[in-house]
Regions:
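Extended, charged coiled-coil stalks and adjacent low-complexity, Ser/Thr- and Lys/Glu/Arg/Asp-rich tails
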Residues: 1-84
Length: 84
């Protein structure tokens, strides 16, 4: 029973960390999108390559983060299916 409780806490902690990291990434995304939109609408120069690289890095971070969370959830459900 203690093992299952520890596993529950681990899944919950990992999910919470994903939510925190997602919030930070959303802030960064909002900033880069706003800067690019402003530059485009004002006819100012902008670095599309930098924007694309940042967007790619953020997307990869999110995929990695949520893939790990999904694996944790599936592992938990498989291991404790009879107790859920």
């Amino acid at each position: 029973m203690q093992e299952m409780m520890d596993a529950e806490e681990k899944v919950l902690y990992n999910h919470l960390e994903c939510v925190k990291q997602e919030a930070q990434l959303i802030t960064v995304e909002g900033e880069i999108i706003t800067r690019l939109e402003h530059a485009m609408s004002e006819g100012e120069s902008y670095d599309m390559k930098e924007y694309l690289n940042t967007a790619e890095e953020i997307a990869e971070q999110k995929l990695k983060m949520y893939t790990a969370l999904l694996e944790d959830v599936k592992r938990f459900k498989t291991k404790y299916a009879s107790k859920l």
